[in-house]
Amino acid sequence: IIDCTASQLVDFAHLGSKFMKQLYKIEAPKVGLLSNGSEPTKGNKVVKETHQLLKEDETINFIGNIEAVETWSGLCDVLVADGFAGNQILKNTQGVAMTLIKEIMKYGVMTNQEDVTKQIAGHIMKNYDFESNGAAIMLGAKKYVLKCRGSSGPKATVSACNMLINLINNKTVFEE
């Protein structure tokens, strides 16, 4: 959802928390809210309202606002964002990862360190390549719904199918 209400963002926090509890066995997942500053007064009207609602919700382990620069810091287990901001974070991360890989490979060629740089680039690709990670699980549906990127190729499709098989085999349920 691109234009979310505060209530919908709180629902996302609940869904994300349940997902992390069930799939990753994190007892009290730390939930952050994507904002343009860590202070509760930062963000647009919806973000400020969501911050207050999450702060008051005793069933959520809310740790506060998270800035984009902290997205991958490990501060939170669940990062709540609307569809527009979340998509921008993901695509920016992929772009930065691909740029870093190119720079690392260029450095390896220039310094005759190609073996080492290939290992580093491979590690980055494994963690940030959408083709390897296949799909995103759409939470809140009664059945499994996985969403692949529009530009996904065969590798991403196979990865998504393997993800679905794993969910089914482990009898993963995302509802109470």
Describe these PLM feature segments.
Residues 7, 17, 35-38, 73, ...:
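Generic serine detector
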Residues 28, 33, 39, 60, ...:
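Short glycine- and Lys/Arg-enriched binding-loop motifs that mark or flank ligand-binding interfaces
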Residues 1-4, 57-81, 85, 172-176:
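Unusually extended, aromatic-enriched hydrophobic runs near protein termini
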Residues 1-2, 35-40, 66-70, 82-86, ...:
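Glycine-rich beta-alpha junction loops
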Residues 75-79, 83-176:
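Glycine-rich phosphate/nucleotide-binding loop
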